[in-house]
């Protein structure tokens, strides 16, 4: 019923509004075009065109079929190339999760541009997660690869890891915060008076990591690092921020960095992927990272540059 020639005929008639013009486009006779459309209407049991002596126009059913037919025909035309890609070991879908600390719209766009040019028939899905939520996606939610899992050792022996670097932290507050000009290391008693600004771990199955907060201290949860930094600048609260994300603000005297009794150690992050079952797209992404190619440099900027 919906063979490629019939679909092309139907689309041509719909686009030209004429059997004769469709015949010219397809190098067929008008009678052949008319017969194909009549047969299609008989097989579907509905009228697809309103006919006048000079032109034809789509019925409601015809308009619906047109929107579907173009997609079907494009799918049929691309199928040989898609099948060859699958036969060559290329995945039909690749799910990639990115740690919130490494996430950058520009970095994702750069990687997607590179991937889409090489694997036009693969569906790519990116997700942004926080702390153990990155491992959670990889372990339990069908993700193929993770950019920025915590640590340098896998949580299961079915994964491979490539260390990316360690995030350095600074304890900050706004320049006009009451603690900003206190001399010497701050005490817990002094810190406890002000809210800790944190981003909640997005893990759903694994145990969530608890961000810095003293017993009895008020905590304010925000959705991302951009909001956290904005809250610090507004004097809402205090807390740790990656050094490359706040150093420029510290240099401008918009934020102040202080020492507290327990400073946060560097946070090592790694690339992680499944040992078995991966395809060529994942293999190529891994190569980009292990070889530190420019296409993925945006994900690693937090380890070696200052940005605000």
Swiss-Prot record:
GO terms for biological process: regulation of DNA-templated transcription. Residues 19-38 bind DNA. Residues 2-59 form the HTH lysR-type domain. It comes from the Bacteria. Keywords: Activator, DNA-binding, Transcription, Transcription regulation. GO terms for molecular function: DNA binding; DNA-binding transcription factor activity. Belongs to the LysR transcriptional regulatory family. PANTHER family: HTH-TYPE TRANSCRIPTIONAL ACTIVATOR ALLS (PTHR30579:SF0), TRANSCRIPTIONAL REGULATOR (PTHR30579). Positive regulator essential for the expression of allD operon. Binds to the allD promoter. This is HTH-type transcriptional activator AllS. The lineage of its organism: Bacteria, Pseudomonadati, Pseudomonadota, Gammaproteobacteria, Enterobacterales.
């Amino acid at each position: 019923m919906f063979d490629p020639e019939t679909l092309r005929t139907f689309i041509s008639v719909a686009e030209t509004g004429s059997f004769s013009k469709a015949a010219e486009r397809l190098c067929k006779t008008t009678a052949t075009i008319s017969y194909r459309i009549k047969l299609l209407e008989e097989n579907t049991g509905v009228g697809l065109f309103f006919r006048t002596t000079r032109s034809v126009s789509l019925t409601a059913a015809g308009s619906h079929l047109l929107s579907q037919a173009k997609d079907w025909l494009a799918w049929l035309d691309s199928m040989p190339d898609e099948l060859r890609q699958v036969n060559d070991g290329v995945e039909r879908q690749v799910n990639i999760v990115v740690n919130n600390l490494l996430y950058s719209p520009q970095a994702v766009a750069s990687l997607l541009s590179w991937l889409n040019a090489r694997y036009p028939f693969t569906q790519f899905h990116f997700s942004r997660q926080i702390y153990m939520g990155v491992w959670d996606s990889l372990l339990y939610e069908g993700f193929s690869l993770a950019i920025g899992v915590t640590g340098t050792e896998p949580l299961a022996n079915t994964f491979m890891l490539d260390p990316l670097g360690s995030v350095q932290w600074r304890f900050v507050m706004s320049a006009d915060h009451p603690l900003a000009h206190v001399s010497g290391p701050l005490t817990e008693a002094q810190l406890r008076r002000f809210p800790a600004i944190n981003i909640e771990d997005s893990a759903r199955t694994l145990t969530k990591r608890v961000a810095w907060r003293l017993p009895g201290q008020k905590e304010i949860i925000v959705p991302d690092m951009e909001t956290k930094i904005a809250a610090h600048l507004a004097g809402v609260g205090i807390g740790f921020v990656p050094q490359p994300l706040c150093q420029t603000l510290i240099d401008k005297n918009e934020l102040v960095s202080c020492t507290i009794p327990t400073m946060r150690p560097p946070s090592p992050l790694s690339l992680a992927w499944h040992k078995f079952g991966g395809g060529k797209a994942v293999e190529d992404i891994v190569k980009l990272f292990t070889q530190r190619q420019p296409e993925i440099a945006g994900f690693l900027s937090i380890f070696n540059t200052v940005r605000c």
